[in-house]
């Protein structure tokens, strides 16, 4: 994936360093969906978002950047209007079957969730990561992903995803839902 093309798609000259490094990792060390089950950074022209609302005020606050699972859910950075740097903005998941939820407080927390190495399940009322140990197959490049996260961000493999999700929802869910209801 070309980082310049990714930035141009968002109409920005800069993107979060964590995202730029992730794109480099996916392009040069691993590949799409090979380091965390169902996940891959992609260039998205907001077609998925437009199925929720075509209002420019809605679209300009959301930055889709990755596939969340193999069935069409996707992750976005949400500009919540607080003037914080983009790498500290909350992450939202839009479900392919419906359901829109805050999933992480920022991009780094999402990267930590990805170390669980299973697709996110997005229902109307909740989101969760579930791993059936009897059926689990580790992603081909998970070890490289874990090494990269440890070296760059001192993050280890996560065993419980609910703490990150709950913390993010406690912090942002109410404001996000209030904002989102204006458009959907």
Where are these regions (language model features)?
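Glycine-rich, flexible loop segments associated with nucleotide phosphate handling
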Residues: 59-60, 87-89, 138-145
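Conserved aromatic-histidine-acidic binding/catalytic patches
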Residues: 53, 57, 95-102, 133, ...
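Mixed-charge (acidic/basic) macromolecular-recognition segments
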Residues: 112-177
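Compact, glycine/acidic-enriched structural inserts
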Residues: 87-128
